Amino acid sequence: MQIKKYLTEDLNLPLIDPQIEIKQRDIFPNQAAPVLLYHDDKLQLVNKNWGYPSPVDPKKPMFNARIERFYENKPSMWDHSFAKQRCLILSSEFFEYAKTTYQVANGKKYHDRYRFKTNNPITMIAGIYDQNDFSMVTTAPNKDTAPIHNRMPLIIEPSELRRWLFQNFTSLIDRSAINLEVQKEPHQK
């Protein structure tokens, strides 16, 4: 499904025509990817790099931001972005590596890998951004992700899009009611 078509036709969002080419592909940390954000009084898709520069070591970007950090009393590097610069990462699915491993014939070990997706054409994941970069927002796992990982992306349903981008998002932290399709990938050979 085309991202722009889904946003403008299915969700009826007043999206300005993106000035970027939107390719449907896998995205990985340290790569550019389109994110949906509200800037200059316009809802727009823009390319940003996945990973905030670390204040400790700029060569080691930070790819995930725990939602709980926003509610802690001590200041964090994420505070301004959580308050004013929220975005949505648009994907067909996301994946996680499990703690469990398997061994192939040559003795090499691999972690089991799982794919997760919502029943919507596009899986929307909460993000925060700064000038050139974005970070994925994570929360406690739900029943589908808990057996595989101790965190999960903060999934946003289409009906919650405006709340994440513009309003108080406290009610979005608990994702236990979100249902995800889970698919274990075949083992390497």
What are these regions (language model features)?
Residues 1-189:
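Short linear sequence motif anchored by a di-proline
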